[in-house]
C-alpha cells in the first residue's frame, strides 16, 4: 500500500495503482499491525487494508499499534485502545512513551 495525495487530500492505493481508500483524509500514516492512522476534520482514527474504518476518527492524536494496543490522546490526556477501538487504559496521563 502507498499513501497518495490528490487535490490536497490523502488516500491509499495498492501495488497495481487501484484506489483502496479514496483521497479524503487530511493526513495519513503507514499501516501498523494491519491498520493505518488517518486524520479527518481534525480527529484521528484507523482504517483497515480494505479502506474501511476500523476505528472512527474521534481522537485528538494517536500512535501506531504495537502488540495490539495504540496510545490515544483525548482532551490533552493519553491512554490506550485495542484494535476494536475499545479504551483499555483510560486517557489520564500527561504523556506516554510506548
Per-region residue spans from a language model:
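Residue-level detector of conserved, function-critical positions
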Residues: 1-98
